[in-house]
Amino acid sequence: MNNMNINEMLKQAKKMQSEIELKEKELYKKEFTIEKQGLTLVLNGKREVLKIDINEALVDPEDKDILEDLLLLAFNEAMEKIDEAHKEIEKQIPSGKLPF
């Protein structure tokens, strides 16, 4: 290989890295909203919980266990959606193969 080919490959690798970083930044800004029977949970692509909204009807002290279960279900579903979004980004990366 000559220097021209190596330089071109390095440029392609840098371009690919920039594209991945841009997609990650877009994902981090994206919000994922999950609703479960009066409970709304909002997370961002960094897996940070941004908001929890609980319908007043769910706040009855006798319903504490139900509320906790709903929170758990909503949170886990949100995490699955975020993981799916991360996998979509990974699919766009040539399976660990750089152009050299």
From Swiss-Prot:
InterPro entries: YbaB-like_sf, YbaB/EbfC. The keyword Cytoplasm applies. Signal peptide: none annotated. HAMAP family: DNA_YbaB_EbfC. Binds to DNA and alters its conformation. May be involved in regulation of gene expression, nucleoid organization and DNA protection. Homodimer. NCBIfam families: DNA_YbaB_EbfC. Belongs to the YbaB/EbfC family. PANTHER family: NUCLEOID-ASSOCIATED PROTEIN YBAB. This is Nucleoid-associated protein MYPU_0500.
